[in-house]
Amino acid sequence: ITXGQVTGSLAPXIAFLRTK
């Protein structure tokens, strides 16, 4: 499980792009 999973709950797309 990554952190992104928690933030992704609200905006997976945005969170994924911001992580990159």
Curated annotation (Swiss-Prot):
Q: Tell me the superkingdom of the source.
A: Eukaryota
User: What Gene Ontology terms describe what this protein does at the molecular function level?
Assistant: lipid binding
Q: Does the keyword Glycoprotein apply?
A: no
- Ribosomal protein listed as a keyword: no
- Alphabetized UniProt keyword annotations: Allergen, Lipid-binding, Transport
| Known role | Plant non-specific lipid-transfer proteins transfer phospholipids as well as galactolipids across membranes. May play a role in wax or cutin deposition in the cell walls of expanding epidermal cells and certain secretory tissues.
Q: Which family is this protein grouped under?
A: Belongs to the plant LTP family.
Q: What is this protein called?
A: Non-specific lipid-transfer protein
| UniProt source species | Citrus sinensis (Sweet orange)
Classification from the root reads: Eukaryota, Viridiplantae, Streptophyta, Embryophyta, Tracheophyta
